[in-house]
Amino acid sequence: MGWKDAAEPVLSRMPAVARPEGHVPFRRKLGWTGGILVLYFFLTNVTLFGLDAATANDLFGQFRSILAGQQGSVLQLGIGPIVTASIVLQLLGGADLLGLDTDNNPRDQVLYQGLQKLLVGVMICLTGLPMVFAGNFLPADQAVATSLGIGTVGVKGLIFAQIAVGGVLILFMDEIVSKWGVGSGVGLFIIAGVSQQLVGGLFSWQGLGGTSGFFATWIGIITGAIELPASPTDLLSTVFLGQGQLLALITTLLIFGIVVYAESVRVEIPLSHARVKGARGRFPVKLIYASVLPMILVRALQANIQFLGRFLNSSWVGMPAWLGQYTSGQVTGGLLYYLAPIQSRSDWMWFLGLTSADPLDIAIRVLIDLIFMIVGGAVFAIFWVETTGMGPKSTAQQIQNSGMQIPGFRRNPQVIERVMERYIPQVTVIGGALVGLLAVMANMLGTIGAVSGTGLLLTVSITYKLYEEIAEEQLMEMHPMMRNMFGSE
């Protein structure tokens, strides 16, 4: 008996959101998407009962814009468990260790979805338990423990239960959006978190609490409320790198422009309908063919490595210096320092006095980050294309099923597959590597609102793709015959 037969009784009974039986009207899809978005913002503002927020430490602070969620809320873990489970499944599927045919076998599809949910539950435990009980990153409030009479261990149990419920909720919220809404829940949550930071970075006012945003700062500079240094060197540093944030604004606008341009670069393969004369179309193979979602997997892998390092530092007294050295919870040396991604200008601009790190160490760290992101982006893009039905074989079958064919070629899926193999694998690798390079460069230069460059890159690309999906949904809504022809529902 194989593992599928042994695991089927458990995996097939995993709770799941029911698929719609027929076509879901566009307005209803928008309603589901908007409702889940409101619920997400609500849950990020529900604080953990029993948490001593004053001494709590956000393990995913540097990666929060990518992993979504909110520190100290029931969505403490964000999409981390979902993404980590996806990494494991991508690696197992890429090595063909699962033996699942998710394209053609309904039974394997059910097993795959059940296995994903099981892995998400495991990742919630593997991430949440050390965070609460071992590393003391989410300490219990002593006053709550005394008033309830259950001790700090009991309060920590309550904290873990809350973040576990939050992890399960975000899993099913993602599934609802994927089946009943527009786009994916993971992408929606990233857009929500990054947009919130971006708007705050542009429009926040010091009088409302916190630091001044970009516009408030420049109003102060223009009116003279904020004094600028007299020295030309200090003036340029303040305007571009300091309060003025001009470099951050330029980087933000540059990322918007590059991503929108890259999304529009494509190779278009002509198609014609086999039975309807004059019906023609094109199959676009975009430069960023695999989308930017594989980049979430790469950054999440880095986040898990750093999470493990901080956990070891807090619980392993004799942790060797070659593995990692920490100062005030931040890695400053050892292997984990070199593996830590560049997050902002303060991590590498030694020539401006923004960091005291050795220039050679900084150069090695930047080089490792570039290699990790470029190679990782390409590898995960390949895995993503193959496991999401975007590879040459799956695409050829979809074109065949829609009644389309490539002019000048026989109407045969094998023939279409050979044509697709000329473009899809190469474009997938180039696009994945390009996104990795852009992510590192964006992080190095910084962005408005202290949003990570990777987070902004993901947000712009996901928003662009969401716009395309909404336009496609509206077209299908106006012309139901096209929906039947291309099998959208």
Swiss-Prot record:
GO cellular component: plasma membrane
Protein name: Protein translocase subunit SecY
Organism in which the protein naturally occurs: Haloferax volcanii (strain ATCC 29605 / DSM 3757 / JCM 8879 / NBRC 14742 / NCIMB 2012 / VKM B-1768 / DS2) (Halobacterium volcanii)
PANTHER family xref list: SECY/SEC61-ALPHA FAMILY MEMBER (PTHR10906)
Intramembrane segments as residue ranges: 60-67, 68-79, 80-88
Segments traversing the membrane: 21-47, 60-88, 111-135, 154-178, 185-203, 245-266, 292-313, 365-384, 428-446, 451-465
Membrane topology of the entry: Multi-pass membrane protein
InterPro entries: SecY (IPR026593), SecY/SEC61-alpha (IPR002208), SecY_CS (IPR030659), SecY_dom_sf (IPR023201), Translocon_Sec61/SecY_plug_dom (IPR019561)
First-listed, main subcellular location of the protein, grouped into a coarse class: membrane
Domain of life of the native organism: Archaea
Keyword field: Cell membrane, Membrane, Protein transport, Translocation, Transmembrane, Transmembrane helix, Transport
Subunit structure: Component of the Sec protein translocase complex. Heterotrimer consisting of alpha (SecY), beta (SecG) and gamma (SecE) subunits. The heterotrimers can form oligomers, although 1 heterotrimer is thought to be able to translocate proteins. Interacts with the ribosome. May interact with SecDF, and other proteins may be involved.
Function: The central subunit of the protein translocation channel SecYEG. Consists of two halves formed by TMs 1-5 and 6-10. These two domains form a lateral gate at the front which open onto the bilayer between TMs 2 and 7, and are clamped together by SecE at the back. The channel is closed by both a pore ring composed of hydrophobic SecY resides and a short helix (helix 2A) on the extracellular side of the membrane which forms a plug. The plug probably moves laterally to allow the channel to open. The ring and the pore may move independently.
Alphabetical GO biological process terms: intracellular protein transmembrane transport; protein targeting
Family stated for the protein in its record: Belongs to the SecY/SEC61-alpha family.
A family per Pfam: SecY
Segments on the Extracellular face: 48-59, 136-153, 204-244, 314-364, 447-450
Cytoplasmic side of membrane: 1-20, 89-110, 179-184, 267-291, 385-427, 466-488
